[in-house]
Amino acid sequence: MAVLTHGSPTPSGAYFDGKGINFTLFSAHAEQVTLCLFDEQGQERQIAMPARTGDIWHGYLPGGKPGQRYGYRVSGPFDPSRGHRFNPHKLLIDPRARALEGKVGDDPRFTGGVSQPDVRDSAAALPKCLVIHEEYDWQGDKPPAIPWGNTVVYEAHVRGLTQLHPDIPPELRGTYAALAHPALIEHLKTLGITTLELLPVQFHIDEPRLQKMGLSNYWGYNVLAPFAVDPDYASGREGISPLRELRDAVKALHNAGIEVILDVVFNHSAELDVFGPTLCQRGIDNASYYWLTPDGEYDNITGCGNALRLSHPYVTQWVIDCLNYWRDSCHVDGFRFDLGTVLGRTPAFDQHAPLFAALAADERLSACKLIAEPWDIGLGGYQLGNFPTGFSEWNDQYRDAMRGFWLRGEVPRGTFAQHFAASSRLFEQRGRLPSASINQITAHDGFTLLDLLCFNQKHNQMNGEENRDGSDNNHSNNFGCEGLVADAAIWQRRKACQRALLTTLLLSQGTPMLLAGDEQGHSQQGNNNAYCQNNILTWLDWGSADRALMTFTADLIRLRQQIPALTQDQWWQSGDSNVQWLDSQGQALSDAAWEQGCQQQLQILLSQRWLVLINATDHECEMHLPEGEWEGIPPFGVSDHAERLTTWRGSAHTICVLIKRD
């Protein structure tokens, strides 16, 4: 019969030392913690944790080996008004579990009880934690260490990017292994992508509401076990674990000079609101892990039912340990933080919040690329520009300004220029670098680039919420016809804007982020909230990809890397050689000219050699070029754009780049 010795309060989690397993669990308010061991048949053995050091409960299992299945039961007060929801009838996941076996279904046994504890035992329905100890030969792997000034981010979903790729073997499509396939890596290299940002690959579950409708949480933001690799994206090949497969992918991408950033979710947990399932933190120490109101209710500043209390000392350390685990075990190069304002809540947002301080103090993590989504839905939740040094931030003001300028004619060129210059008013005055602005026209959340030009209204009926979900503020323009079916004249205008927006994104100062599929002309049929669509709506259709647009995008990225004003990651100053702002006559824009309403024509001279010509009007225009001899460069040809070396005639919604002859 298994017996636990006292063991040690460190290391955290379930750790195999070669002779046995040391188990630890944090709970400040528990009265008893019970370790539950399971055999292959699911038979359970319960053993009380024999020791407590501070708020860490611990025990050591002599002879325990990797592959051991386990969970916890935690006893204590059930007093919701004080934030306590202990219930020993509920088996609980270790918040530090590095692997899980099984799935979470829509099972009533997970209900923990709203006003009184639910006595149905949940062990048979809950996935079991697995102790793992996997050695791996990285074969000298080193991080690509791409400078921020050269970084081009490509946001992608493991399955969506690879599920329909014809050159990847069918058994590998939609998996981590597909990311390592030469065909996928060749696409990224041909495009010029430096940094692949993956939507969550942490172990996530599908909300009960989606399961009832036959849908799933495709994006993966409903995370249950943040230390564990999600097995849903593993190929299941014999002898190759999900962790190894992800490691293989990172190693292959690194060998190709491509960084890997993980989108991580620490703002909320998969336990949802008070009516949600009791699976982990709620039953372990609800009052420590979650932000609660004075009467014990969940403070739902995320819109997901709960919010993790990341300013609590232990919860702060839990996040730091998790990030270091991913960095050390998978060699990832950085992290994008979903609803990042929660990271700094104390409960008000604070640049000096404990988690920010811990990140800055950690030499390994502070050297990573850290990207924040700088908002949540709580009071004071919008914090664009306010994150501490070391973070870059998703810039929705850039997105809306560029959409409004090109598609709606409602943004003046002064506003356009300010955001083209890495939103300098937001970041420069706060001591941040241009790379702090993660520029985007589109992201996973919202319309794709093509849909932005084909739909004025969202079409989210497939999501099962009667089209209520998703944003109604899209700044889109269908050019007179809703949908993908339109006449040639409308498509001509759409394609012109498609190229104009891509050019603007990839030639703006700051860090560009390209949504996977935008370079191919991918459409989601007007669905701007496809979080639950694990199907051909979200999977890239490589067979019908716009090859000309892919070439255009690759040429733009190559062009970007040639322009010092865009790669040196230094602020442009008035009168320096980085930028000159010119009017349609090739003359420097005066202060008065900047203020002239919604002028939609502009010339931008970068590094004294590359001239960006912009006509965002709905009619043709002629521009006089500044002094010098100019010629077109890929993807812009002289024959297409320049009538002669002194003028340029631009069609409606057109952008062009010329280079000055030596």
Curated annotation (Swiss-Prot):
The protein's annotated pathway: Glycan degradation; glycogen degradation
Alphabetical list of Pfam families matching this protein: CBM_48, GlgX_C
EC nos: 3.2.1.196
InterPro entries to which the protein is assigned, alphabetical: GlgX_C, GlgX_Isoamylase_N_E_set, Glyco_hydro_13_cat_dom, Glyco_hydro_13_N, Glyco_hydro_b, Glycogen_debranch_bac, Glycogen_debranch_GlgX, Glycoside_hydrolase_SF
A single GO molecular function term of this UniProt record: glycogen debranching enzyme activity
Keyword presence, Zinc-finger: no
Reactions catalysed according to its record: Hydrolysis of (1->6)-alpha-D-glucosidic linkages to branches with degrees of polymerization of three or four glucose residues in limit dextrin
One GO BP: glycogen catabolic process
Family: Belongs to the glycosyl hydrolase 13 family.
Name of this protein: Glycogen debranching enzyme
Organism, scientific name: Yersinia pseudotuberculosis serotype IB (strain PB1/+)
